[in-house]
From Swiss-Prot:
An example Gene Ontology CC term for this record: extracellular region
Superkingdom field: Eukaryota
Record keyword Secreted present: yes
GO biological process, one term: killing of cells of another organism
Localization, UniProt: Secreted
Location, primary (coarse class): secreted
Keywords: Antibiotic, Antimicrobial, Disulfide bond, Fungicide, Secreted
Protein's name according to its UniProt entry: Androctonin
Taxonomic lineage: Eukaryota, Metazoa, Ecdysozoa, Arthropoda, Chelicerata
Length: 25
């Protein structure tokens, strides 16, 4: 199984992208 969570990260410049993270939160 994949314990990966997809989070959306937005930068100040106005660029948003999705990143795969394994953070506890």
């Amino acid at each position: 199984r994949s314990v990966c969570r997809q989070i959306k990260i937005c930068r100040r410049r106005g660029g948003c992208y999705y990143k795969c993270t394994n953070r506890p939160y």
